[in-house]
Amino acid sequence: MIRCKPLLGTYVEISVNETSPQYSERIANHAMDQAFEVIELVQKLMGFHNPDSELSSINARSHIETLEVHEWTFKVLSAAKEIHTLSAGLFDCAVGAKLIRAGLLPNHKNTQTIECGDLSNLILIKPNKVRSDKPIQLDLGGIAKGFAVDKGVETLKANGIESGSVNAGGDLRVFGNISKEIQVRSPTNPNELIPIGALEEGSIASTGLYYSKSRDDMNKLSYIVNPLNMEHVEFNGSYSILAPKCMYADALTKVFAISQNDSHPCFEHFSAQAIKITA
């Protein structure tokens, strides 16, 4: 059984393996309903485009006061800071102000003239409080989508689904006793899919500039920013990461694309592998 809904700025497809002895349509539909609900909650909590999201509150007020946040938001921020440290700053989701100035993100609070800090300025206070010692503009789009996929899989399992997959616009996780053929978009022709093998019990995420550089918007800046020099990164090729958890696969694609290093030291820490499709 396969169902699809528009979420996370893309289409989220949930697939349940119908060959399991425990499979029933009622159980599958209920599990899928629950999985879509948790994915929608991630979007509600961490969406940059929503001025009422918890993330928008962090961006607006964390430098003024300590804020209590949802445990999932805290978990994603904790993972983001861990990757920031292990990648020596190459992953930094605090580049939101740069993306606002480029017109790639909405300007909710007229922040274009404010000097913002980086992820090192964000302070996490267990169990679930955050503050920042400088104004900050976090964009969790490069990690929260993968987290949402992981939560979807976790929810399917908790509701009796033994095998299946969750795919959020190319952020894919497969679980159970099935394998799924993997295809990556051609960096020169996004309508062409390039097969790269089969995935079993794991995740893959990819990044490329094939959409931001379509014929209609050739003048648009890249949405990938190098945090070390705050320049928009222009690159050819498609960059994919395989990892056990989709949250880490999602985030590490940015490290790969910026570093151009398929053996970056932080990949081993997250049991991740890198694949590049050249233009």
Tell what function each PLM region has.
Residues 1-279:
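Mature catalytic core of soluble alpha/beta enzymes
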